[in-house]
């Protein structure tokens, strides 16, 4: 309230005892109010008491008035709020009653309409009746195919109308012409990158209405019963009609000029009128009438769609005509390079060109011949045969479908003629098998080779088991195993079309597509031959490529192997073929099936990537192409950083150098920098395009003297391809030179800078780093880098020491050839026992005692630290995971049995066992089977018989992965040992989120929830479940996260 003013204050008598005395002396009628200023409304008043006994209390009465006024105001406010809420509830109740009433009316209407339709379709077939019901339902008021009804209040607008979507969105790629109802569908289409202009179904919407056509007289019928009546009436005419003549089901209509498909004839006519497509692309008669929609049978529609899908297409830039192979590449191109241009889709054929296959001029049913032109039709008609003619495109399509469905494949038309692609499986003929005195195999597909010799000699005994053999004579227990071996031996893998990464497992590739490319590219990968650098789309095509261009592992076959001779024949043959895997097959083991076409004794090798080629032309083309080798080609003139792609250089200059682009050309093979692209290309052509050599094969089929005999190493092969011990220094140098780049490429060995934490996979990169970054610190007297082991991270001063360390400590023996029976495997060290058995059969005389002693010593160590034939999980594959769990099966062997459900996707389980524990996989556990099937479980080879061997292995591999994996991937160790707490403290120093869980203190559901919460990036701690558990793992986990948070805050404050 405002200030009452001086005039009102003056009229108030003073307070206190003096005021009371003066008030009693004066008369009430003598009181006057004097005002000097302008009149104002009276804001306060004085309660005048008539009684002399009562004392006026101005302040007390004013306080009571204010309090009463405030309470009344609050009461009125509450009353208004309650009234407003009551009205709101009443309105909602009325709306709900209206919705319920409308829903009941709709249900009653549908029920009545359904009863009416059931009476109408009693005489129709089930399929036709169901289709009519769907058509009638779509015509009803209410739900629509182009309307959105989410069940919320937005669906019901004023007047009970339903919200409808806006105008369909057109794909921004030119010539794609696909439309979508909303942006989400368009985004999925863009990610799938299916912009083929040769797609006749883009205008095919809604249900397909069936009608029936006669393939003899080309008449159309609405129902199937009318067609049957037509056949009964025309059977006696003997003009081709018969009771067995199947009708052609008309499901859609095609535009006569562009052959786009439409659900109804009205839609097709509307399209023809809009596009002015009243001209026929194929004229089969002189009739000059107006073109009309072509009735397209179901068989022709499926055939046209299938042929159009096989038509390759490309998406190119309108400005620079660069081919764009993915949505990611397209987006990056138009963001960096051609910002004012657009993409266009180009197909090798148009729909009209594909539809030309349906054009047939005549058909003779007597001799089953098809005629494609008028001359051949008339010539054959003169012979007296009755020919069915097609005078329009519609009649030609009906005749085509009648011929194709009547005889597959047709004799002359070859409608389904596809390239004869051979399978990898062969079937031996009876003549060949009898000539070799062996049992006739059950399967063998002929690939154009007339004779197949060298089959395994097996006597006709029983019982027999089925086995699969590769061309290299290795035996496998299943067809999947031998096919996987053929793919691996021929360097076949899968290549991602989006980013170009390669992988040997299709499951890993699909996981890569799902994780890194949004899930829309699950099938957007190709088959890639690393030897020939060739991309093929289909699996059958890659098989044909293996058969034509490769040798040694081109096929496999199936045979009935005698069970009795398995123990005698298989160990020696398996070891022999095992030792000769990387060498040309012996003439005793495998006979050359095509000696006339056999390649020369030698191959060409590229010195840059060490890939081998069959001819000089192939290796020359490989070296001439800049895309064959991946190296840095561009350099920033500001900071001398190098890049693979020019787009990356542009982004670098925009971010780091204020969009000032200064580019130079850099040769990553020899570290030279050029100012112009012509100089770089000239340098590459002169020096690197001819960097290949011819590698001759020393082995010969006929050996005349002992001097011509090459020393054959008889020791066992290691997992890297080298031998366990060598008798010849030349063989050792060759194998080590071949093995070292492979170890560096796979990350088994790597270079580490001595001055900083930089790493590299080859000498060139580490030397470049030392020269550019540590120019001032470089000294010729001391080495600026060390070579570290990728498994135990031990450092060495030279590559030879590091390679020898890897062979001694981490290279396991290769697994011998798989046999169905698996004889002589009683030892717990299966691989070492099998390898020693092979050495026993193939060992040379006792002149090699020194090598035997060395081999025996290494063999004893390997029996304790043996790694099976499988390699450790690939680091690139582990980078795709969201959680790495190390399980100590010595402490908790029933890990999978305690899990109540599946773990989150991206959780990788790495199991360890040691001591006397003999952990067996729970084959009946669904969680274990699922993780094994998707490749998210790996059982580490038995460490040793020491009690703490598994703990040491966990620490070693966890430390190795901590250096190689991104820091956001958490590690969890499931073990009851308290020694891992120190490992957790070490991980804190490296900023790695790590958790140590004791499985003995956790229930299965609690542990599963903890593991899933760790892998979830948006996890929140469940404080309710763990509030009463004092000292529980959940509290330890929460405390650990608090400590990490405090440490991060402290570190950030120090930096500030």
Swiss-Prot record:
Residues 849-858, 1033-1045 have a biased composition (Basic and acidic residues). Residues 1-344 are annotated as: Important for interaction with SUMO1 and SUMO2. Residues 168-521 are annotated as: Important for interaction with SMAD4. It is an enzyme of class 2 (transferase). Residues 1-246 are annotated as: Sufficient for E3 SUMO-protein ligase activity. Sumoylated. Predominantly sumoylated on the N-terminal region that is important for interaction with SUMO1 and SUMO2. Sumoylation is important for localization in nuclear granules; desumoylation leads to diffuse nucleoplasmic location. Autosumoylated (in vitro). Sumoylation enhances E3 SUMO-protein ligase activity. GO terms for molecular function: DNA binding; SUMO ligase activity; transcription corepressor activity; transcription regulator inhibitor activity; zinc ion binding. Its EC number is 2.3.2.-. Residues 42-50 are annotated as: Interaction with SUMO2 2. Residues 1-39, 806-830, 839-858, 1019-1045 are annotated as: Disordered. A zinc finger (C2H2-type) spans 169-195, 212-234, 253-277, 315-338, 362-385, 494-517, 527-550, 604-629, 634-657, 665-688, 751-774, 787-810. Keywords: DNA-binding, Isopeptide bond, Metal-binding, Methylation, Nucleus, Phosphoprotein, Repeat, Transcription, Transcription regulation, Transferase, Ubl conjugation, Ubl conjugation pathway, Zinc, Zinc-finger. There is a cross-link at residues 75, 77, 106, 139, 153, 167, 270, 275, 283, 288, 301, 309, 420, 431, 539, 583, 645, 704, 729, 746, 788, 815, 843, 849, 947, 988-989 (Glycyl lysine isopeptide (Lys-Gly) (interchain with G-Cter in SUMO2)). Homooligomer. Interacts (via N-terminal region) with SUMO1. Interacts (via N-terminal region) with SUMO2. Interacts simultaneously with two SUMO2 chains. Identified in a complex with SUMO2 and UBE2I/UBC9, where one ZNF451 interacts with one UBE2I/UBC9 and two SUMO2 chains, one bound to the UBE2I/UBC9 active site and the other to another region of the same UBE2I/UBC9 molecule. Interacts (via C-terminus) with ubiquitin. Interacts (via N-terminal zinc-finger domains) with SMAD4 (via MH2 domain). Interacts with SMAD2 and SMAD3. Belongs to the krueppel C2H2-type zinc-finger protein family. This is E3 SUMO-protein ligase ZNF451. It comes from Mus musculus (Mouse).
């Amino acid at each position: 309230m405002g200030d009452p003013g001086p005039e009102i204050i003056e009229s108030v008598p003073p307070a206190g005892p003096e005021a009371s005395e003066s008030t009693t002396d004066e008369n009430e009628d003598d009181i006057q109010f004097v005002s000097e200023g302008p009149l104002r409304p009276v804001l306060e008043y004085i309660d005048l008491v008539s009684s002399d006994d009562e004392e006026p209390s101005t302040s007390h009465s004013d306080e009571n008035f204010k309090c009463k006024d405030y309470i009344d105001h609050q009461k009125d406010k509450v009353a208004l709020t309650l009234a407003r809420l009551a009205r709101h509830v009443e309105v909602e109740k009325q709306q709900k009653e209206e919705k319920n009433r409308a829903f009941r009316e709709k249900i009653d209407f549908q029920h009545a309409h359904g009863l009416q339709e059931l009476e109408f379709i009693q005489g129709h077939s089930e399929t036709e009746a169901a289709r009519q019901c769907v058509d009638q339902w779509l015509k009803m008021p209410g739900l629509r195919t182009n309307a959105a009804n989410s069940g919320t209040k937005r669906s019901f607008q004023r007047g009970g109308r339903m919200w409808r979507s806006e105008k369909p969105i057109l794909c921004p790629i030119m010539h794609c012409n696909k439309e979508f109802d909303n942006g989400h569908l368009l985004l999925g289409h863009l990610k799938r990158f299916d912009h083929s202009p040769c797609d006749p179904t883009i205008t095919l919407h809604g249900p397909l209405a069936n009608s029936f056509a006669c393939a003899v007289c080309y008449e159309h019928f609405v129902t199937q019963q009318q067609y049957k009546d037509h056949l009964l009436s025309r059977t006696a005419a003997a003009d081709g009609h018969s009771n067995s003549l199947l009708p052609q089901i008309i499901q859609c209509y095609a535009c006569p000029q562009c052959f786009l498909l439409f659900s109804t004839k009205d839609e097709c006519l509307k399209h023809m009128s809009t596009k002015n497509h009243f001209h026929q692309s194929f004229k089969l008669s002189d009739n000059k009438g107006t073109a009309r929609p072509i009735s397209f049978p179901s068989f022709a529609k499926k055939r046209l769609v299938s042929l159009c899908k096989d038509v390759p297409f490309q998406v190119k830039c309108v400005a620079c005509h660069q081919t764009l192979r993915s949505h990611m590449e397209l987006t990056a191109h138009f963001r960096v390079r051609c910002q004012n241009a657009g993409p266009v889709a180009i197909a090798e054929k148009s729909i009209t060109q594909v539809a030309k296959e349906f054009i047939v001029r005549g058909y003779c049913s007597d001799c089953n011949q098809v005629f494609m032109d008028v001359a051949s039709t008339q010539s054959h008609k003169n012979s007296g045969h009755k020919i069915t003619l097609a005078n329009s495109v519609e009649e030609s399509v009906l005749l085509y479908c009648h011929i194709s469905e009547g005889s597959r494949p047709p004799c002359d038309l070859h409608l389904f003629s596809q390239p004869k692609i051979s399978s990898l499986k062969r079937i031996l003929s009876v003549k060949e098998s009898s000539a070799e005195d062996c049992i006739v195999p059950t399967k063998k597909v002929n690939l154009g080779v007339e004779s197949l010799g060298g089959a395994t000699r097996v006597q006709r005994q029983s019982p027999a088991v089925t086995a699969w053999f590769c061309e290299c004579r290795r035996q496998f227990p299943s067809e999947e195993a031998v096919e996987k071996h053929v793919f691996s031996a021929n360097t076949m893998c899968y290549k991602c079309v989006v980013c170009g990464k390669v992988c040997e497992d299709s499951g890993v590739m699909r996981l890569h597509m799902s994780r890194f490319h949004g899930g829309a590219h699950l099938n957007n990968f190709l088959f890639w031959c690393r030897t020939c650098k060739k991309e093929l789309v289909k699996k059958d095509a890659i098989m044909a490529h293996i058969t034509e261009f490769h040798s040694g592992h081109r096929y496999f076959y199936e045979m009935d192997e005698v069970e009795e001779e398995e123990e005698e024949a298989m160990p020696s043959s398996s070891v022999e073929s095992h030792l000769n895997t990387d060498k040309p097959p012996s003439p005793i083991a495998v006979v050359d099936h095509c000696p006339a076409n056999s390649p020369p004794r030698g191959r060409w090798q590229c010195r840059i990537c060490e890939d081998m080629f069959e001819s000089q032309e192939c290796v020359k083309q490989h070296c001439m192409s800049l895309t064959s080798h991946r190296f840095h080609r561009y350099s920033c003139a500001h900071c001398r950083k190098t890049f693979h792609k020019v787009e990356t250089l542009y982004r670098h200059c925009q971010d780091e150098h204020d969009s000032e682009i200064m580019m130079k050309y850099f040769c990553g093979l020899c570290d030279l920098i050029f100012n112009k692209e012509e100089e770089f290309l000239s340098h590459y052509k002169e020096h690197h395009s001819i960097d290949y050599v011819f590698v001759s094969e020393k082995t010969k089929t006929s050996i005349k003297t002992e001097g011509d005999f090459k020393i054959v190493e008889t020791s066992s092969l290691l997992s890297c391809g080298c031998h366990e011990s060598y008798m010849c220094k030349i063989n050792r140098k060759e194998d080590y030179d071949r093995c070292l780049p492979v170890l560096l490429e796979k990350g088994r060995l790597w270079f580490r800078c001595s001055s900083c934490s930089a790493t590299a996979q080859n000498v060139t990169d580490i030397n470049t780093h030392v020269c550019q970054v540590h120019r001032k610190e470089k000294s010729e007297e001391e080495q600026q880098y060390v070579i570290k082991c990728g498994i135990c991270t031990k450092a060495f001063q030279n590559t030879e020491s590091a390679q020898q360390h890897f062979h001694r400590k981490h290279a396991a023996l290769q697994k011998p050839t798989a046999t169905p029976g698996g004889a002589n495997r009683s030892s717990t060290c299966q691989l070492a026992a099998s390898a020693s058995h092979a050495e026993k059969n193939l060992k040379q005389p006792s002149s090699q005692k020194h090598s035997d002693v060395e081999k025996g010593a290494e063999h004893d160590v390997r029996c304790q630290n043996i790694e099976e034939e499988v390699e450790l999980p690939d680091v690139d594959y582990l980078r795709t995971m969201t959680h790495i769990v190390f399980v100590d099966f010595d402490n908790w062997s029933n890990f999978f049995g305690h899990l109540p459900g599946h773990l989150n996707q991206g959780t990788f389980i790495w199991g360890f066992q040691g001591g006397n524990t003999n952990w067996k996989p729970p084959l009946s556990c669904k969680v274990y089977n699922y993780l094994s099937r998707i490749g998210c479980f790996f059982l580490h080879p038995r460490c040793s018989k020491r009690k703490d061997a598994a703990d040491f292995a966990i620490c070693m591999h966890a430390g190795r992965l901590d250096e190689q994996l991104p820091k956001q991937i958490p590690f969890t160790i499931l073990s009851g040992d308290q020694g891992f707490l120190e490992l957790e403290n070490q991980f804190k120093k490296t900023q790695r989120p790590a958790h140590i869980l004791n499985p003995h203190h956790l229930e299965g559901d609690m542990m599963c929830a903890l593991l899933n919460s760790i892998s979830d990036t948006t996890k929140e701690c469940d404080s309710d479940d763990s509030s009463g558990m004092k000292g529980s793992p959940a509290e330890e986990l929460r405390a650990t996260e608090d400590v990490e948070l405090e440490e991060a805050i402290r570190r950030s404050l120090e930096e500030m």
